[in-house]
Design a protein with these regions (language model features):
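Short, surface-exposed acidic
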Residues: 33-39, 65-68, 116-117
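Conserved active-site and cofactor/substrate-binding residues in soluble primary-metabolism enzymes
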Residues: 20, 76, 146
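C-terminal cap/substrate-recognition subdomain and adjoining C-terminal extension
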Residues: 80-94, 101-157
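Active-site neighborhood of HAD-like aspartate-dependent phosphohydrolases
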Residues: 1-58
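Metal-dependent phosphoesterase signature
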Residues: 50-83, 91
Length: 157
């Protein structure tokens, strides 16, 4: 891997996008009372983020994905994002997006910007079976995507 003098690691949900696509997509198919209950458990430390997201998605039918993608299509990208990417390219600073959300969501939203993004790391959502399955090689039991582990893959000063 290349040694970078400077590198930008950017979060996706709520940083590049104007809202969190994970939370929004969960709300599409989950009982609002259940969402509140599990959000409370997360806030009280009774469940980890990894557990809550797995619970929500792995109980959902794979057939829900098209509806989720329709929702993702409606989520905005923050103003100035393209200009930021263009400036980083001029300065020869690579931009790596690390998303704790689903690859299908981030890849879809970032498609118009791919030429400026060095790499996208995201959680995989397997929809090949009747139920969704969350796959992440960087799940540490607390987070689905332990971003510091991904950052450690890159050599930078």
């Amino acid at each position: 891997m290349d040694l970078y003098k400077t590198i930008i690691f950017a979060d996706f949900d709520g940083t590049i996008t104007t809202e969190d696509t994970i939370v929004g997509s969960i709300r599409l198919f989950s009982d609002p009372k259940e969402v509140e209950e599990y959000n409370g458990k997360l806030e009280r430390g009774e469940m980890t983020l990894s557990q809550v997201v797995r619970y929500a998605f792995e109980d959902a039918p794979s057939s829900y994905l098209p509806r989720m993608l329709e929702y993702v299509d409606q989520v905005g990208i923050r103003p100035g994002f393209q200009e930021f990417l263009e400036e980083m390219q001029k300065l020869q600073i690579p931009v790596v997006v690390i998303s704790g959300g689903m690859r299908q969501f981030s890849q879809r939203k970032l498609e118009p910007y791919r030429k400026w993004i060095t790499k996208l790391h995201a959680v995989e959502l397997d929809v090949s079976g009747p139920k969704m399955k969350v796959i992440s090689p960087y799940d540490d039991g607390n987070e689905l995507m332990k971003k510091t582990d991904v950052m450690a893959l890159y050599d930078y000063e």
